Amino acid sequence: MAKTSMVNKANSKPKFAVRSYNRCQRCGRPRGYLRKFKMCRLCVRQLALRGEIPGVTKASW
């Protein structure tokens, strides 16, 4: 889990627009962010394996 202080800091409007960055909506993680799901890769994988994200399946070839 991300530090609460850092999540709050990211939610506030930055002095310059360039300083804003994306964070996972579930856990607040700043890295490995997937825009399509608005979550980090770990949360997407966790939900996809449980079948909670419609249309997402594990690849097999």
From Swiss-Prot:
PROSITE patterns, from UniProt?
RIBOSOMAL_S14
| CC cofactor note | Binds 1 zinc ion per subunit.
Q: GO MF annotations for this entry?
A: rRNA binding; structural constituent of ribosome; zinc ion binding
Keyword check for Metal-binding, yes or no. yes
Per the record, its GO cellular-component terms are: cytoplasm; small ribosomal subunit
Cross-referenced Pfam families: Ribosomal_S14
Keywords tagged on the record: Metal-binding, Ribonucleoprotein, Ribosomal protein, RNA-binding, rRNA-binding, Zinc
Q: Name one GO biological process term.
A: translation
Q: Which residues of the sequence carry a binding annotation for Zn(2+)?
A: 24, 27, 40, 43
| Cofactors named for this entry | Zn(2+)
Q: Which family does it belong to?
A: Belongs to the universal ribosomal protein uS14 family. Zinc-binding uS14 subfamily.
Q: How does it assemble?
A: Part of the 30S ribosomal subunit. Contacts proteins S3 and S10.
Q: What does this protein do?
A: Binds 16S rRNA, required for the assembly of 30S particles and may also be responsible for determining the conformation of the 16S rRNA at the A site.
Under which name does UniProt file this protein? Small ribosomal subunit protein uS14
Gene name of the encoded protein: rpsZ
